[in-house]
Regions:
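Acidic, proline/glycine-rich intrinsically disordered inter-domain spacer in sigma factors
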Residues: 1-11
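Membrane-interacting alpha-helical segments
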Residues: 46-49, 63
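C-terminal edge and immediately downstream basic/flexible tail or linker adjoining helix-turn-helix-like DNA-binding
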Residues: 56-76
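Residues within the DNA-recognition helix of helix-turn-helix
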Residues: 51-54
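Substrate-agnostic recognition of the 12-TM MFS/MFS-like secondary transporter fold
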Residues: 3, 28-29
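Helix-turn-helix DNA-binding module
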Residues: 11-14, 18-22, 30-47
């Protein structure tokens, strides 16, 4: 089950808009904070926050049945 869950999550993340996906991966998989992600991508911290929020909304919509588990695992 765990492998299937992570596979579905990875596929859903790959479908995120490019900039949103970059921010999401940097913050949630690479452990960067908002400031570091903003510096790396040369965007504002507010843009990082907005992209993270947008990514979570898209994933929540696309993975409704699994979202509570993702929220628990990743603190979304």
């Amino acid at each position: 089950i765990e492998t299937e869950i992570f596979s579905r999550l990875r596929k859903a993340i790959e479908k995120l808009p490019r900039e949103c996906r970059k921010v999401f991966e940097m913050c949630y998989f690479e452990g960067m904070n908002n400031e570091k992600a903003a510096q790396t991508l040369r965007i504002s911290i507010e843009t990082v926050k907005a992209q993270k929020k947008r990514g979570k909304q898209i994933l929540r919509k696309n993975l409704q049945e699994l979202y509570p588990l993702f929220a628990l695992l990743f603190g979304l």
